[in-house]
Amino acid sequence: QKLVYLSDELHKSFVNKYVRKIIINAYRTAGKANASCWTATQSIKDYFLYKDAKAEENPVTIVTQSTAMFLFNHKQADVEYLQQLDNLNENDIQFIIDAAQGECLLVDTTGKARVRIILLDSELDFANTNVELEKERSRRKA
């Protein structure tokens, strides 16, 4: 049985270099324990804030050693960080910048795929983040 550990907003823990070291070590060794560590954040930039840190204390290690990434919409200001990912080309980066709600670039060790997630109307009740779509849905329900 495999254990998956998902951490959201993990970058808030990166302030302390000792905590960074523990987190990075956990990500590096999880596979040996039949576990998988996942992290979620709003911007890839969060992992590049400590570029001068040693490898064992540098959060970018989590990204560069990941076997898979789901890259959803990023801001134009994040391009410089996306360009530092070896497995992305300019077309991939432009797709990520232009991605609409539910679109992402899936990158793993075997390749890349552009993914569009289409939510059912019932799923939109708890997963929608598009304010305009929510207004339209409310008008239709009324």
Model region roles, listed by residue range:
Residues Q1-F95, D121:
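Conserved P-loop NTPase motor cores
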Residues Q1, I96-A142:
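Conserved P-loop NTPase motor module
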